[in-house]
Design a protein with these regions (language model features):
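Sec-dependent N-terminal signal peptides
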Residues: 1-9
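Pepsin/retropepsin-fold aspartyl endopeptidases
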Residues: 8-384
Length: 384
């Protein structure tokens, strides 16, 4: 272990580590406490690792309290003795792995043993290069603060002086009011905030009800959410003429956070993070900054462990599914000819049901033993 720590200190040049881009996530291989594992990289998680509790990393040494968009919960931890990403050795001092019961491969629809958080890269000048699917660990001598951005394709940002082990950056509503949104590669959506935050900055009228409400899944459970059309926001210094945000229909759980900017926005940029100097560099390589509304049938479905089948958990009122008579509790047998007979992740189910606005999807259902076949349009379930 001492030799690994010495090597971590000695590494001073540029080190590149490839990662895999899943549909809405970064998957990276790492050796943790001698185990070869794969992780979803999540800058929104302030710790080091969250690992499936069925994987042995050593004796449990403590507990950690975790927070997501919905609430808080406690999990057991294991002290880390070694961490390595490719040829990059990470000093594991004071790092812990949270041991949590979860099937991450099931969640991310690719082999995944857990989550790698911001703490792993925090002490480095780290580039998340989406363009070439790799991390670039730059030498400490690289000072992005000396760069001059053009504020069209390149942007230099100062981290806000709030939060712990988090990258809080400035976001402005169309009326200029500030939102505190963390840079969060683990959020699969474009931008996620809360209903009370929209009310505070004047983007939603208090006590008014959204027309289209769906259900989203986070670590602490299911939560009502909906999509809001936003025109003229400025996200991390970038002018965004039109975008669609996911809104959690619960109050924000922290005065220091209004939500996060997620994968849907970040995937358009190469990002350099220098936490010690409190600076972030963005390079827009795709030419895109906004997102398109998701085409939805109005069905929320997921695998039911007790019934051993995919079942409908919610039908959005006034949606194509509601108009077709689909009901909560119906079993989903196949989507566009793909059988759903085995265990399948909710992200994969959603990817089959949803798609571009204006396209169609054919779904086979069963209800009380009776088979039904329906062709549904995918529509934009957007709240103006």
């Amino acid at each position: 272990m001492l030799s690994l720590i010495a090597l971590a200190v000695a590494q001073s040049g540029t080190v590149e580590v490839p990662f895999k881009r899943a549909e809405n996530a970064i998957i990276v291989d790492a050796v943790v406490n001698g185990r070869d594992l794969s992780f979803m990289f999540d800058t929104g998680f302030s710790g080091a690792f969250v690992v499936d509790h069925n994987i042995s990393l050593g004796k449990e040494t403590g507990t950690m309290r975790l927070r997501d968009f919905v609430g808080e919960f406690d999990a057991k931890t294991v002290k880390l003795t070694s961490v390595k990403l490719g040829s990059k050795v990470i000093d594991p001092a004071e790092m812990e792995a949270v041991m949590q019961p979860a099937d991450y491969s099931f969640s991310y629809d690719t082999h995944c043993d857990g989550i790698m958080g911001f703490e792993v890269i925090k002490k480095n000048v780290t580039e998340i290069n989406f363009e070439k699917s790799k991390f670039i660990f730059h030498p400490k001598s690289l000072d992005i603060n000396s760069r001059t951005p053009d504020n069209k394709r390149t942007f230099l940002l100062k981290m806000l002086p709030i939060g712990h082990n988090a990258i809080k950056l400035d976001v402005r509503a169309p009326n200029g009011k500030q939102l505190l949104l963390s840079l969060d590669t683990g959020n699969a959506f474009y931008t996620t905030t809360h209903r009370d935050v929209l009310e505070r900055v004047g983007l939603w009228t208090k006590d008014s009800k959204p027309k289209f409400v769906k259900q989203s899944f986070v670590a602490s459970g299911a939560v009502d959410s909906w999509t809001k059309k936003i025109e003229g926001a400025k996200i991390y210094g970038v002018d965004v003429p039109l975008s669609y945000w996911d809104i959690i229909d619960l109050p924000s759980g922290s005065a220091e956070s209004d939500g996060t900017v997620g994968f849907g926005f970040l995937k358009n940029f190469n990002i350099i993070i220098d936490y010690d100097r409190r600076r972030v560099w963005l390079e827009n390589f795709t030419g895109k900054v906004g997102n398109d509304p998701e085409g939805s049938t109005g069905v929320t479905a997921a695998f039911d462990e007790r019934q051993n089948r995919v079942r409908v958990f919610r039908v959005i009122p006034n949606s194509p599914a509601a108009r077709a008579g689909i009901q909560m509790g119906d079993s989903v047998l196949s989507v566009n000819g793909q059988e759903l007979g085995g265990r399948i992740g909710y992200r994969e189910v959603a990817a089959l049901l949803d798609g571009p606005v204006g396209t169609k999807v054919t779904i086979n259902f069963s209800r009380n033993g009776q088979l039904m076949r329906m062709e549904l349009d995918r529509e934009a379930m957007v709240n103006e």
